[in-house]
Amino acid sequence: VGSAPEAGFYQAPTLLRDVPATHRLAREEVFGPVLAAMPFTDEADAVRLANGTLYGLAAGVWTRDGGRQMRMARAIRAGQVFINNYGAGGGVELPFGGMRHSGHGREKGFEALYGFTTLKTVAIRHG
């Protein structure tokens, strides 16, 4: 990977496994190359854990079951849900943004225009 610059704070890519649901890493948004992997018992438990935080920027689901992919994508309260990948896509045509404490509104995509415009209806009767 190379060496980190001497100034600033840098974290090497890190996977933390068996993180308890009550741990700070499971409850806050961690920006950086850090993944907190948490054990779960079934699909409902996984959704409960994913939604058990005040934040909702992004989530990742790994499963081959197409029905489960769609159920979890609908049930998880996050602005983005990645299925069997993480961070793939996300071009300028796709809206980006979070839910709850992760922010309001959207960047990118047609949806982002709503934050910069005001809609108005003008009705004119001629004649």
Give residue spans per PLM region:
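Conserved C-terminal structural/oligomerization subdomain of aldehyde/semialdehyde dehydrogenase
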Residues: 3, 10-127
